[in-house]
């Protein structure tokens, strides 16, 4: 569960290392974001010579949460930390590689590109 001020690691090769959620998109009173939800983030830590710079604002999709996601069969998929993938204004991934596993819940029409780039889909 990601909320405003939550810090997430970045699971792509855009050059950002850590981002902070500044808004959960999808409704004026929406408080939490889970896996597959779009959030507005600001870059808090970036590598030198990366595609993104510290202080820039982007859309991002949450790909891993420590809270996890409950499946229809009753199983629960949890991760060690929270991670996101940065998106452009057309909601396409900015990076060309994804690091670490992602869940099957991302296999919607919007994020098939992320699923195809990921090394492992749980």
Curated annotation (Swiss-Prot):
Pfam families: Ribosomal_L14
Keyword field contains Ribosomal protein: yes
GO biological process, one term: translation
GO function term, MF aspect, one: structural constituent of ribosome
Cross-referenced InterPro entries: Ribosomal_uL14, Ribosomal_uL14_bac-type, Ribosomal_uL14_CS, Ribosomal_uL14_sf
Gene Ontology CC annotations of this record: cytosolic large ribosomal subunit
Keyword rRNA processing assigned: no
UniProtKB keywords: Ribonucleoprotein, Ribosomal protein, RNA-binding, rRNA-binding
Assembly and binders: Part of the 50S ribosomal subunit. Forms a cluster with proteins L3 and L19. In the 70S ribosome, L14 and L19 interact and together make contacts with the 16S rRNA in bridges B5 and B8.
Function: Binds to 23S rRNA. Forms part of two intersubunit bridges in the 70S ribosome.
Sequence similarity: Belongs to the universal ribosomal protein uL14 family.
Stated name of the protein: Large ribosomal subunit protein uL14
Encoding gene per record: rplN
């Amino acid at each position: 569960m990601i909320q405003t001020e939550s810090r997430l690691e970045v699971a792509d090769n855009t050059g950002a290392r850590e981002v902070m959620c500044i808004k959960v998109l999808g409704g004026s009173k929406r408080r939490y974001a889970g896996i597959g939800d779009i959030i507005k983030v600001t870059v808090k830590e970036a590598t030198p010579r990366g595609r993104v710079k510290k202080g820039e604002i982007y859309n991002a999709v949450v790909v891993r949460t420590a809270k996890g996601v409950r499946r229809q069969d009753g199983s629960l998929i949890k991760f060690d930390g929270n991670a996101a993938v940065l998106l452009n204004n057309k909601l396409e991934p900015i990076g060309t590689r994804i690091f670490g596993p992602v869940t099957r819940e991302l296999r919607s029409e919007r994020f098939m590109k992320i699923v195809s780039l990921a090394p492992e889909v749980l």
